[in-house]
Amino acid sequence: GPSKNTTPILDILDREQVPATFFVCAQDANENYMPLVADIAAAGHQIALHSATHQYSKIYASTDAFWQDMKALRQALEPYVDVESIDWLRFPGGSTNTVSHRYGGRDIMKTLKAQAEDKGYHWIDWNVCAEDATASIGAA
């Protein structure tokens, strides 16, 4: 996300008093929903980086390409939140993905994880796969 589902999700989180972290993308499909990032932050939820494009072939072509994608995402977020306060990210495909090997070599994820830490980012994965990256399920 953000997406058309973000406002209803925010309503549920507010009603149930549950804090959340939103791993944000800036793809063309959610361009019109980017102002909702301000609502997410105003509600006290955490904003974290995920990807500007979510196109593995571009993101993982090199470490420079990955950080260019993060820069583009940060620029897309600047009108809505203090991007300097964002210090969490989730790698597209996860930190142990193998799809990145196809584009940036076998060691690209090891290098990116070290670079992320050197840049002051904490990175996170997940422990349950909702299959939302493999099917046409709506984003948050």
Please provide the spans of the model-predicted regions.
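Flexible loop residues that form catalytic
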Residues: 94
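Alpha-helical scaffold elements lining the catalytic groove of polysaccharide deacetylases
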Residues: 8, 55-81, 97-140
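Active-site beta->alpha N-cap acidic-glycine motif
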Residues: 1-91
